[in-house]
Amino acid sequence: MKDSIRSKLETLAERQQELTALLAEPEIASAQKKFRELSQEYAQLEPVIGCFRDFEQAQSVLNESKALLQDQDPELRVLAQEEIAAAEKKLERLDRELHTLLLPSDPNDKRNIFLEIRAGTGGDEAALFASDLLRMYLRYAEQRGWRTEIMGDSPGEHGGHKEIIVRIVGAGAYSRLKFESGGHRVQRVPQTESQGRIHTSACTVAIMPEAEEIDDIDINPADLRVDTFRASGAGGQHVNKTDSAIRITHLASGIVVECQDERSQHKNRARAMSLLRTKLKSEEEAKLVAEETATRRSLIGSGDRSERIRTYNFPQGRVTDHRINLTLYKLDEILQGNLDAIIDPLVAEHQADQLAALSD
């Protein structure tokens, strides 16, 4: 094992010990959101640290067995050689497991998704191909036990879909389909083609993780400047005699809120904080919408035939994924929703790239 990998694992083991101590603290246990976050982090570390402990134990057995090779007892030396072979085999397996466990996880992998299919180059034929792709993804979702819901549909003039959006709900939806984003090209003879010529059309697919609802906003008191001032307007004589009004400036965002409706400074502060939370939450939600829009634009491209990740060639019964140079002569099976034959190699290639980066 490389020193850099061992160092990373030792750091993670220390972090797990820190989490164990934190989760035992009463103030953490009473803060539900923080407790949940730390518990999730602990659960993510557990399989990694468990595997690392097994690796260390196997390494210890290997070292002890090698020491026994110097023993004068020949039977003990034979036994030591057997234990060395077993320990080396186990270490090799655990090393592979650790590398896989250390791969950076995509925080969106567990999310539900929105699938968008948009007809690109090819007019009516592209709209019909969009319908074929939709059927393929719906059948794949059905095979995996996912729930689907049509969110929006713009039908083609002569059948198919100009654009259609589907919400897919189920475990691993994003992790399995995230590599489907891009241009999908079809080569076939349209039904309206009397000369039997092959036409090329294209659709774009975008896979977008569904945004989670924003939890209650956490506000750092250090980010606040609180000013008091004498209230004006309605409220009787009392409002003009004390500095009961509150103005709160959120330094990080520049948002300013104030409240002078109540006679009590405490109540005005509570109302102002409530308004600040609402404004910050609204700002976060607007930011999420903007990010989703940007993601969608980056994924769907222009719909031009040149921006392609995959080609479906009907005359040859062929599907080619150009990113990994994978060609399968299983067009009918794939269009029936048997997508694992393409998705599994894509996932494997992605993991191989991550492992290569991890080993650098």
Swiss-Prot record:
Q: Where found in the cell?
A: Cytoplasm
The identity of this protein, by name, is: Peptide chain release factor 1
Annotated organism of origin: Nitrosococcus oceani (strain ATCC 19707 / BCRC 17464 / JCM 30415 / NCIMB 11848 / C-107)
What's the stated role of this polypeptide?
Answer: Peptide chain release factor 1 directs the termination of translation in response to the peptide chain termination codons UAG and UAA.
Q: Which domain of life is it from?
A: Bacteria
Q: Which GO terms describe its molecular function?
A: translation release factor activity, codon specific
- Give an example GO cellular component term for this record: cytoplasm
Q: Which gene carries the instructions for this protein?
A: prfA
Q: Which residues carry this modification: N5-methylglutamine?
A: Q237
